[in-house]
Amino acid sequence: MKIISALGLLILFSVSCNSNGDVVLDEESLQKDDSIGIKYFGNTQGTTYAVIVNDEIELLNREIDEILHQFDLALSSYIPNSTLSKLNKYSAGVFTYKDSLSFFNRCIEQSRFVYELSSGDFDPTVYPLVDGWGFMKNVEEIPDSLAVDSLRALLGFSDGYHFKFNYVGQDSVYNVTKKTPNAKLDFNALAQGLSVDVICELLEGKGAKNYFVEIGGEVRVKGLNSDGKLWTIGIDKPVEKSNALNRVLQEIVQLDNKSIATSGSYRKFYEKNGVKYSHTLDPNTGYPVKHSLLSATVVANNCALADGLATAFMVMGPNKAVKFIKENQNLDIELFLIFDNSKGRQETYMSKGFKSLILK
């Protein structure tokens, strides 16, 4: 359900200010700055990635690109021959797939965990609903209530409902029983976070202890930056029509061995007949959310969880999200919300642990 513009987060060790005094990332200078560790940049999953390592390890750029390419071949909904695309186009019955690197199965398992944890507010079967509202094609379509009801009948990620996955395979070959022909999966709300975790596992396997990994705005860090300090991350202030050149920071946090992901609705919406329609769809109703939450930032131990929960909180809204955090303190996650109050003014909520992360 993450149809938002990525990069709700900004790394701050190489920044400049534009004419308005806003902080912006100077990526060109970052690439040229030899004092900032080993740097890798590239494109993946329809977005960009940045990997910075402050340890002496062997060059990894080809390995990173190959892993992310294989990740796309497993989970991209835009590559026609990806495992996910083939499953979505499959009519019904037993679908067989090869998952040598376990990317597909890991995404299924992580997605089901967040789906159950959020009581369905995070739902990877939302693809038909997103498509029905025109968000897949970037067209403004408002389906009638009958269409919404028929689309909602295709939702639900409980095991065996629309899909029954068999995790016992041979020679990395697995199968899934697709029970509903028009049911489709969309892992956009969690896959980028999972790909961050995968790259971090690669780095740690090479002995890296100090690194920064960012893919599409989802971030995981460990250890220290080139200045010997904790990694510093900025969180965008929700401003409509903002971009990398005019962004304003709401808060700055310092992290070690943590992941951070932000999801928001303030950049992605369309307006028709004076009504704004958010691109964040509630799978429980089939309609765009109407609450006042503008962005949700989650800090967690792994990026897949942070990514998925950030999307779930955008569906929940501020009150339900705060209740969730208070009732699930065993998860070791922290939350930062930005929302409009009843007077239309922005307010924030920080979990107790999040407050300790703020750069003083």
What are the language-model segments listed below?
Residues 15-360:
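Mature catalytic core of soluble alpha/beta enzymes
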